[in-house]
Design a protein with these regions (language model features):
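Residue-level marker of alpha-helix boundaries and capping positions
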Residues: 8-10, 46-47, 85, 130
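A short, structure-level motif marking secondary-structure boundaries and short turns
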Residues: 2-4, 39-43, 78-80, 123-125
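Glycine-rich, positively charged N-terminal anion/phosphate-binding segment
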Residues: 35, 41-60
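Catalytic domains of carbohydrate-active enzymes, especially glycoside hydrolases
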Residues: 15-37, 101-105
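Active-site acidic/histidine proton-transfer and metal-coordination neighborhood
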Residues: 16-17, 54-63, 76-140
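Boundary/entry segment of secreted carbohydrate-active catalytic domains
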Residues: 1-15
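Active-site-proximal loop/turn and secondary-structure-junction residues that shape catalytic pockets
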Residues: 9-11, 34-36, 74-76, 110-114
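Hydrophobic faces of well-ordered beta-strands that scaffold small-molecule active sites
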Residues: 3-7, 30-32, 67-72, 106-108
Length: 140
């Protein structure tokens, strides 16, 4: 059996040290949410470049840790078209970055049909699900 961990649940250390620590703890894969794990360099959409992916991939490989999931947990059910466009752009950047990183999965959530990303009873309805599916299609 191989065990993985959400990297943002590990000891807060500089990126390279954190991944080495994950290996020392016995984990072989991790869930990477860049903004929650990395503080010493930017992880904005524009920063998610092939060069950054190559650097990070080498750090993971050196420590025998795979990236199992690249986390991008934003509200794809957001009803505000301007906010949704930014969210969609962020997902596209993460999907590209995941492919360069050698990660086959970008994590998401179904979201909430409001701008505040608040859990409300409407989150569990058919309309919310269809909104999510509609908004997910351009991303995948």
């Amino acid at each position: 059996m191989q065990l993985g961990i959400r990297l943002h649940d590990t000891k807060k250390l500089p990126f390279e040290e954190r991944i080495a620590n994950v290996h020392e703890l016995g984990f072989v894969c991790g869930h990477l949410a860049p903004g929650k794990v990395i503080s010493e360099f930017p992880t904005t959409d524009e920063a998610l470049t092939p060069g950054l992916a190559m650097y990070m991939k080498n750090v993971f490989a050196k420590n025998q840790v795979d990236v199992a999931v690249l986390g991008c947990y934003l509200n794809l059910a957001n009803p505000n078209p301007e906010q949704l466009a930014k969210i969609t752009h962020r997902y596209m950047a993460h999907i590209r970055f995941a492919s360069w990183l050698g990660c086959g999965v970008v994590g998401t959530e179904t979201g909430a049909p409001n701008e505040t990303y608040t859990a409300v009873p409407e989150c569990h309805g058919e309309e919310a699900l269809q909104t999510f599916i509609t908004n997910l299609r351009p991303v995948v």
